[in-house]
Amino acid sequence: MLGLIGKKVGMTQIFQKNGIVVPVTVIEFQPNYIIGKKTVDRDGYSALIAGSVDLKGSKVSKPIKGQYKSLKDIEPKKYVIELKGLDGYDAGDEIKVDVFKSVKYVDVTGTTKGKGFQGAMKRHNFSGGPSSHGSKFHRHLGGTGQATTPARTFKGTKMAGRMGGNQQTIQNLEVVLINEEKRAILVKGAVPGAKGSFVVVKKSKK
């Protein structure tokens, strides 16, 4: 599966030839290198291991250094992904942005913005209680328990709690523009995460 590790720069808009304004997300790519391979004989399946963004020296342990011994001039990477079904690359090769030239739609995986502890109305889109005078609750989630049987609250019941900070994938985002010089692509619509967060862009599955 064709893919790259990139950084979400932010959102903007562009005009199409017919004058329609399209909201787009700018995703910038630092060099992505093949840092290893998985084989059927050794691992049970074949895949390429790609990495991007140099890891800070103080965070590089001896086991990590050992993984990069055979790679010349490539520093240990902070973000690493597996790419299945991608051929024609060897360890040390760079995957460039132009691989998306023939791709029309992509799936983008990122980490959603963390919202902290939130109530049921914001977290689960509950309607809340009456807003009028006399009501004793306005933003409460309502009842959470059962009757005498089973006399307990079921696990997984939607309640207030920590919101955001989860991995999320948005599928079938259209590739609007590819800028090889700036190592960036523009995709139609929004992608998960805050500005500056790292995302994985892969050729759409569907």
Swiss-Prot record:
Region annotated Disordered sits at 127-151
> What would be an example GO MF term here?
rRNA binding
Keywords attached to this entry: Ribonucleoprotein, Ribosomal protein, RNA-binding, rRNA-binding
Task: List, alphabetically, the InterPro entries matched.
Answer: Ribosomal_uL3, Ribosomal_uL3_bac/org-type, Ribosomal_uL3_CS, Transl_B-barrel_sf
Q: Which terms does the UniProt entry file under GO BP? A: translation
The chain's disulfide connectivity reads none
One cellular-component annotation, GO: cytosolic large ribosomal subunit
Q: Which Pfam families does the UniProt entry name for this protein? A: Ribosomal_L3
Q: Which domain of life is it from?
A: Bacteria
What's the stated role of this polypeptide?
Answer: One of the primary rRNA binding proteins, it binds directly near the 3'-end of the 23S rRNA, where it nucleates assembly of the 50S subunit.
HAMAP family in the record, alphabetically? Answer: Ribosomal_uL3_B
Q: How does it assemble?
A: Part of the 50S ribosomal subunit. Forms a cluster with proteins L14 and L19.
By sequence similarity, the record places it as follows: Belongs to the universal ribosomal protein uL3 family.
Q: What is the protein named? A: Large ribosomal subunit protein uL3
Native organism is Borreliella afzelii (strain PKo)
What's the source species' lineage?
Bacteria, Pseudomonadati, Spirochaetota, Spirochaetia, Spirochaetales
The gene designation is: rplC
